[in-house]
Amino acid sequence: MATRARIGIKQKSGRIIESYQHWDGYPGGLGYNLCENWENLKKVTDAIKLGDSSKWGVIIGEKHDFDADRHGSDFEHMNCYYNRDRGEKDCGYKVYKDEAEYIENGFRSGEQYVYLMKDTGDKDYLGNPKFTWYYVESRYTSEGKEVIDTEFKPLEKYAILEHIDILKRTLEQMDERKVA
C-alpha cells in the first residue's frame, strides 16, 4: 500500500504548481528526500512540470522503461513519471491560485501529505532567495473522521526525526534476523 502525496512549489505570483507522487509519501521518506535533495528552485519546478509520478528519487533522470528489470540501473536514483516513463495520459501538473486552494484540492486522491516549497523571505550567501519545505497532513480521529491541517508547517525537523525512527527500526530488524 502506498502513502500518497502531492509536491508543490509556490511561485513569485503566489500561485502553486503541483503534481501527485504515489510511493513513500510520509515525511521520513519523501519529505526527508525533498529536504535533502530538492532545494533548487529550477530542479523542483522542472520535476513538478513532468507531472504525476510513482516516486521521486534524487534526480529527475531520463526516460526509462517502467517495466524493465531495474537491478544495477540508476532507476532508484531517478524520478519515475506516469507519462514520461509509463506512457500514461492525463497526468500533468496542476495549478492553484494560492495555498488555501492547494490544501483544499490536495487530498482528493487518497493523499496523506501535501508538500510545498516556498520562499522563506531570507537570502542565501549569494543574495538569492532561500526556499524551504512545508507540509500539511490528513489524519483520522479514533471516530474515523478525517482531519486536514489548515496551514503549512515546517517540514525539515519532523522529516529528520521520522527518518531517524525508520533507520532505528531497520537496525532493530537487522538485529532480530541475526538472532533468528
How would you label these PLM feature ranges?
Residues 37-180:
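Low-complexity intrinsically disordered segments
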Residues 31-37:
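An exposed acidic His-Trp-rich patch
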Residues 1-26, 30:
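Short, extreme N-terminal segment that most often corresponds to the first beta-strand
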